[in-house]
């Protein structure tokens, strides 16, 4: 693999991230136009973003990078019950510990139930789950492994980390 191809593949993976996000947001916006509640649209956008990115990256890995998804750090997907339990209990334990450890008045946001649902659905489904899922596939999956194949593990760890930081500054 040439340096040019490794760099090109890395930027193509970031482009796939952007395109997946734009398509997901566009489709979710279309649902909003037909009066689907905003909170539901946020969940749709998150699911579409993660799903589209996976499908596009899988096609990219097979056709362009010519590596199986497992070689890019993305083996067959399987969810174990203990991780579902951990995903539910961990935030609850952190929040509970916080409430027990720190005193003070509870301040209400005065938001309606709909506003709370809209805010939480965007924060959890899109920003919390989908964005993290896609960013890991792109930066720690495709980019890290393509650069590791071309150079070495040190460069493969440092370069995606810098790119990741740069993308978040934008």
Each PLM stretch: what is its role?
Residues 134-159, 163-166:
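Membrane-interface helix/loop boundary segments of multi-pass membrane proteins
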Residues 6, 18, 43, 131-133, ...:
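Hydrophobic transmembrane-helix microenvironments that flank and shape a buried ionizable site
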Residues 7-11, 15, 43-44, 81-88, ...:
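Hydrophobic alpha-helical transmembrane segments
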Residues 60, 104-107, 165-170:
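Membrane-interface helix-cap regions at the ends of transmembrane helices
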Residues 17-23, 92-97, 161-170:
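Aromatic-anchored segments of alpha-helical transmembrane domains
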Residues 29-41, 66-137, 144-145, 149:
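Juxtamembrane helix-loop-helix connectors linking adjacent transmembrane helices
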Residues 1-76:
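N-terminal, membrane-interfacial amphipathic/helix-forming hydrophobic leader that caps
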């Amino acid at each position: 693999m040439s340096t040019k191809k490794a760099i090109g593949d890395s930027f193509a993976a970031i482009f796939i991230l952007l395109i997946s996000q734009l398509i997901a947001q566009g489709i979710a916006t279309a649902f909003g136009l037909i009066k689907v509640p905003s909170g539901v649209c946020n969940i749709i956008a998150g699911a579409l973003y993660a799903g589209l990115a996976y499908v596009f990256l899988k096609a990219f890995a097979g056709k362009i990078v010519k590596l199986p998804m497992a070689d890019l750090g993305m083996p067959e997907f399987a969810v174990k019950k203990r991780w579902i339990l951990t995903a539910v209990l961990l935030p609850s334990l952190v929040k509970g510990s916080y409430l027990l450890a720190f005193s003070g008045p509870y301040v209400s946001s005065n938001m309606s139930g709909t506003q709370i649902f809209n805010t939480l659905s965007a924060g959890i489904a899109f920003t919390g789950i989908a964005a993290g899922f896609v960013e890991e596939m792109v930066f720690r999956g495709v980019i890290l492994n393509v650069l590791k194949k071309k150079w070495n593990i040190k460069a493969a760890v440092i370069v995606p980390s810098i790119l990741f930081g740069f993308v978040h500054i934008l």
